[in-house]
Each structure stands twice: as structure tokens, then as C-alpha cells.
Amino acid sequence: MVFKRLLGALGVGGPTVDTVLDPAPARPGGTLTGQVRLQGGNADFEIEHITLELVARVEAEHEGGESEGAVAFERFTVGGGFRLAEGEQREVPFSVTLPWETPITELHGQGLGIVLGVRTELSVAGAKDKGDLDQLNVAPLPAQEAVLEALGGLGFGFRSADLEYGRIGGTGQRLPFYQEIELLPSPRYAQQVNEIELTFLANPGGMEVVLEADKRGGFLSPGHDALTRFNVSHEGVEHQDWPAIVEGWIGQLVEHRASYGPPAGYGSPMGHGSPAAFGQGGHGHGHDGHHHDGHRSGPGMGTAVAAGAAGLAVGVVGGMVAGEVVDEVGDFFEGEEEEEG
């Protein structure tokens, strides 16, 4: 869907702008392509700059609770320096590179409830107007998809996803926010953790995988959080045994046997080396859990996302029907623009 607006800063008779993104979803660190379509007004106008701004709906925690707001996390100048004649139609194609930490919004075409938008700013004769917004769809990188599919195969279920304002200490995070994907524990770990939160922090060479467990308390001990971090390469993803790798990560997280020495293996208790993934000790609060033998296979995370949590209708993600995400983008950012005005 394309959101089309008349340039308010120029009033009636000014040029109009549509930004149309190419239909295929983009990927973190990948190329976003499309066209900015301009329609001339009732006079000639000097188009100084055409700027695209990537904006996300982000949650922030503070003393008063939680609030949501729009955070712009990248800007690109894609055109300008020309005269748009009266009534002229012109297309300005663009190709820009997304930040590596751009959140993913879907898995196998199923929305995760993350709201990202591309907002167009036109600078005309000294006036600027943020005139057009389009929904941005981002699919996972191969390594991200492999981790999610492995978690689904191990019996973990999708609960929700959101963007949190702030930084994760000890990581190479660059954006002012990070994505949290909340997972329901598999039956094997249901007695030990309430949920597991997953964060991907991608970079040109690979990505950091941050796992946090909300661990259940015992009869005499309170519950607490445990955190571990692992590094994964973009190379050789298709040659790895991801269920075994991820199961090793979960074992370290739940048992809290993270090693603070040099990276060894991919994080499993056996410590087998792998060029595509290696475990790295993270931070957490020490508490030994109980390891249960056995392995549960099941549908991949794509199926789990499509089905949603047990008892919820198919397609309901984070309290919002996936098909309504487009409207949510428009409503949310229009509200932000009214506040800015």
C-alpha cells in the first residue's frame, strides 16, 4: 500500500509524492529499491532534495511505565537538484542499503507485529515536508532464519516481537534500539523458564545472538534472568547442524554454564569447533538448572509463527492481526506527524 499526501508545507497546488517500494521484502544489510513518483503542481518547483527516512515504532521503559514512539534510524538522500515543471510526472528510482541491525518484520511471509516505515521528505524552495510513508517489510537473513527454524523444530513457540529502546551491554550494537523476539519454552524446558527472549545483532561479518531466559523460581529460590551471547558467521550457514547448535545454546542458557574463556566450539557442552558459529560467554546470574535427556522435534518456527500461541487465532501476532499491520503503520506515523506539527 502507498500512502499519498499533498505537501502541507506548500499548500494546495503544490507537488504530490508517492514512494513505491519494490514488492520483494528487503533483508538486513541488503538493498532496498523502489521509486519516488512526483506529480507537479500548478506551478514550477525547484526540487532541492528527496530524502528517505527509515522509522520504527519503538517501546521505551521509564519510571512511569512504558510508552511508544517513532524512532528514525537511517536517512538517505536519493535525488534532487532539478526543476519539476507544472503538472510534470517524474519517477526517481533509488537503491539504498539497509543497516545490518534493521529488525525483521516477517518470517515466511507471516508478519511478526513489528512496524517499520519509509518516510519521504521533499525539500522544495527552502520548505521541507515529510509527505509520504510506505510500509517496510524485512525478511530474515539466512543465519537468522536458520536459528528461528531450529528453535521451532526444538519445540519453542512464537509469543510476540517488539522493538526496545536502549542498548545491550557488551555487544557491538549500533542502533539506539534492539529487537526482542519472545518465545514460549518447549515442553523440555517449561518447568525451568517462563519464556526466552531472542535478539539478533547483525553486522557485515556475521551476527551476535543474544538469548535471555526468564527462569522460574523454586520453592526456596526466586526467579531471575539469565543471559548468554553467541557469534555466528554469515558463511557456511547451509552446512551447519543448526538444531544441535541451538540446543547447545539453550543448554548453556538454562544451565548457565557459560564459559568466560576464549570461544570454543559452537556453544554445546561438547564444544565442537565450527567455522559458522562459536559460543561466547555472556552475562547472567548464576543458577544451575536441571538437564533433561531427550529431544523433541516439531514444526519449524515459520509454522509456529503462522499458528500463533495456543488458543489464539491463526495470524494474530502481538495482539494485532497481521493483515492490519499496513493500517497500523499509517495510523501510527500519522499520529507522530501530528505531534511534530
Where are these regions (language model features)?
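A eukaryote-biased signal for short, well-structured alpha-helical docking elements
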Residues: M1-V12
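A short beta-turn/strand-edge loop motif at beta-sheet boundaries
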Residues: G41-E48
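Internal, hydrophobic beta-strand segments that form the core of beta-sheet-rich folds
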Residues: E53-V58, S95-E101, H108-A127
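Short aromatic-acidic-glycine turn motif
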Residues: V55-E68, R216-P222
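A beta-strand/beta-hairpin structural motif
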Residues: E66-H108, K128
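Short beta-strand elements
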Residues: S123-G155
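Extended serine/threonine-enriched, polar tracts that run as long, contiguous segments within proteins
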Residues: G153-P222
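Short, low-complexity, glycine-enriched hydrophobic/amphipathic alpha-helices that associate
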Residues: H287-E339
